[in-house]
A protein has these predicted regions:
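Phosphate-group recognition and catalysis centered on beta-loop-alpha active-site segments
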Residues: 2-282
Length: 282
């Protein structure tokens, strides 16, 4: 059950909060306006023959609340290469799509995911994010609901495991394979043991090793797991030297998070073709 404190917050304090804030609703509306996507093609970066393969960070979070089903649907609609999500595990061992380990003010609810059942989480609605008023009936998705968005599409689901868990990884693999997404889905994590475990469960699933910097050690660790293991590295932490190292080692990689045309062009000119973004499109 939701804790007594959480009930007090949800049933008493939140309504008071919004009644006090009601005069400022125009400001809230202003802060939740969608942002216009910035086209790389229109700014001379990439082409249909040699494109940048873009990952939508937590879905297209410029047009819909991050990690919501509408944000992933926008990724498919706008032709993104992949759409990244984050998953956490509920009290009743269901994988759900949310970045933080707890629900927060974006849902006007509070509590740790690991302390809440799926049924309890499904009572929470989005109350913050681009176009939120259009998606007032949206709920935190399950992993299965997220994956269903990509069945029969060209956009790849990209699943980041957000917690240190090993005994429920088979549920992730099963959800992927049951939908025929084995060759389409990507699983990524900072945890090498989780990557190895996923690889052992199904070596056909593509894995991305999340790292800050692309070092010789990180490259060797990824290669040790298998041929279909990429690096997903921080754009801010990697120099041209790091990029050249990865290329010379023949390891595939993607850089996050790139949000300006200038950054994307500089990377493109260096030969980088895979980036993650909040705002760019082709």
């Amino acid at each position: 059950m939701i804790s007594i404190i959480n009930k007090i917050i949800s049933l008493i304090l939140v309504p008071i909060y919004f009644s006090v804030l009601s005069p400022t609703y125009p400001i809230i509306y202003l802060f939740n306006q969608p942002k216009e996507l910035i086209s790389l093609y229109e700014n001379g970066v990439g082409s249909e023959e040699d494109p940048v393969y873009l990952t939508a960070h937590r879905g297209v979070n410029a047009l819909a609340p991050e990690n919501s089903l509408p944000s992933f649907e926008e990724a498919v609609k706008n032709g993104y290469y992949s759409a990244e999500c984050d998953i956490q595990l509920t009290k009743d061992n269901r994988w759900v799509v949310i970045h933080n380990a707890e629900v927060d003010g974006r849902f006007c609810e509070y509590g740790r995911i690991e302390d809440l059942t799926l049924k309890e989480l499904k009572t929470f609605s989005y109350n913050w994010g681009p176009n939120v008023w259009k998606y007032k009936d949206s709920r935190i998705p399950t992993l299965e609901e997220y994956l269903d968005v990509f069945v029969g599409t060209q956009t790849r689901p990209q699943i980041e495991i957000g917690i240190e868990n090993y005994d429920k990884l088979d549920n992730i693999v099963n959800a992927i394979t049951q939908r025929g997404l084995t060759k389409q889905a990507i699983v990524l994590t900072y945890n090498l043991k989780q990557l190895q475990a996923i690889h052992d469960l199904n070596p056909e699933i593509e894995l991305w090793y999340l790292v800050d910097e692309m070092t010789p050690e990180a490259i060797a660790q990824a290669k040790a797991i298998g041929d279909n293991v990429w690096l997903s590295a921080s754009y801010d932490k990697n120099t041209e030297e790091n990029i050249k190292l990865a290329m010379s080692e023949n390891i595939n990689f993607s850089l996050f998070t790139v949000n300006t045309v200038e950054e994307a062009k500089a990377l493109y000119d260096m030969g980088v073709r895979y980036i993650e973004t909040d705002i760019l499109c082709n």
